[in-house]
Amino acid sequence: MIDITLPLTDIHRHLDGNIRAQTILDLGRQFNIALPAQTLETLIPHVQVTSTEPDLVSFLTKLDWGVKVLASLDACRRVAFENIEDAARNGLHYVELRFSPGYMAMAHQLPIAGVVEAVIDGVRDGCNTFGVEARLIGIMSRTFGEAACLQELDALLAHREKITALDLAGDELGFPGSLFLSHFNRARDAGWHITVHAGEAAGPESIWQAIRELGAERIGHGVKAVEDRALMDFLAQQRIGIESCLTSNIQTSTVASLADHPLKTFLEHGVLASLNTDDPAVQGVDIIHEYHVAAPAAGLSREQIRQAQINGLEIAFLSDGEKRALREKVAAA
């Protein structure tokens, strides 16, 4: 189902949601951190979704073991590097990795700006080693409140030239976008792109808010957009992309089944929706699974899957020249 003549992208992929179970074991042993299991086989149920979670917040607890072992900046650098290695193994040509530096720093009180620098270094080294092209998106974890998000923003802005965009993720219902207007004003002033997790746990009004108040150019998940025809029209007309994550939305109980997922409707409506993983290690999936298994199960035709692949590059945070160069590189391979 993947068109090998086109660039393969993953533009909604959490770096801190893609920490290998083996790496969690390794770092746990290195730093004498008590883990819930001592073998890879017995650890996996604690760090990977093995059945549908009742809600988004329950799903997010599966991520916690990955960051609990980040006891040094070198550990952060390692998982960033491994994220690029994983992308290369999946055949990705271009990936946008998003990460919450405050979340990664929290368990061991690491310097947040140091975490940002370590991630930048690890991704750079990975790209140089494996030939994948990548951009970084900084996340503010809304669940921790406005002040904590301000700390994350300051740390990201200290390395603003290496960050491409700002995102807001976490508890969408408890911490609406309206709390973070000044944060996004600063991000836009820095020249960053804006993407926002919206319409995942909350309704279409959250997507409208992300666009109108926060300046979102893309929406993460956005499944509730299907409930508002005017919003669907607006997304299509204004070319505001939807970063769809099929398997993730089932595992978080955001959508009841793949057959009920709105991605097919988005594509039929002309919305620039793409296929992405979200948290690959936690979900136990990769981009190949999303194209070959999840997308057909969601009712997408071969041509719609190809369109989603095209959309992934179309809405990527790259210049027109960078997109053209990537298309030419893949076509010539």
Swiss-Prot record:
Site entry: Important for catalytic activity: H221
Disulfide bridge partners, by residue number: none
Any one of the GO BP annotations: nucleotide metabolic process
EC annotation from Swiss-Prot or TrEMBL: 3.5.4.4
GO terms for cellular component: cytosol
Reactions catalysed: adenosine + H2O + H(+) = inosine + NH4(+); 2'-deoxyadenosine + H2O + H(+) = 2'-deoxyinosine + NH4(+)
Pfam families for the chain: A_deaminase
Annotated catalytic residues: E200 (proton donor)
Residues noted as binding substrate in the record, renumbered to the chain: H14, D16, G170, D279
Record keywords, A-Z: Hydrolase, Metal-binding, Nucleotide metabolism, Zinc
Co-factor requirement: Zn(2+)
Chain residues that bind Zn(2+): H12, H14, H197, D278
Cofactor: binding details: Binds 1 zinc ion per subunit.
A GO MF label: 2'-deoxyadenosine deaminase activity
Database matches in PANTHER family: ADENOSINE DEAMINASE (PTHR11409:SF43)
Family listed: Belongs to the metallo-dependent hydrolases superfamily. Adenosine and AMP deaminases family. Adenosine deaminase subfamily.
Matching NCBIfam families: aden_deam, PRK09358.1-1
Annotated HAMAP family: A_deaminase
Primary role: Catalyzes the hydrolytic deamination of adenosine and 2-deoxyadenosine.
This protein's name: Adenosine deaminase
Protein's organism: Salmonella heidelberg (strain SL476)
GN (gene name): add
